[in-house]
C-alpha cells in the first residue's frame, strides 16, 4: 500500500493545495509507477513537465527512497537534484516552493518530510 498526502505551498500569489495519492494494491501501484515512467520519458525528450507531473515525480522519489531505507534527512537534502528549472513549465518552481509529505508505505509507520525549494531557481529568469 502507498498513501501519500502532499501539501504544497508556493509564492504568496499561488494558493496552497493538497493532493492525496492512494494506491492500495499492486495493480494501482503499477499504474502509479507506469505514469512516472511516462513523465520520465517526457523529460528524456526534453519536454517540460507541469506542476502535477512534477509533484508525482517527487512522490515517486520519496517512495523509492523510503523503500530503500534512505534516511529522511538524505531524502530531503537530495530533493533539489531531481528537477531543474529548465525541465519544468514556467511557474512550476514558484508553485512548488515547499512540499510537505505524510507517507504510509506498506506496513511501516507514517513518515513526515518536507522539501524547501526543491526546484533550484538560481539561474532561472522570467522574461518580461
Pin down the residues of each PLM region:
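Non-transmembrane, aqueous-exposed alpha-helical and coiled segments at domain scale
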Residues: 1-128
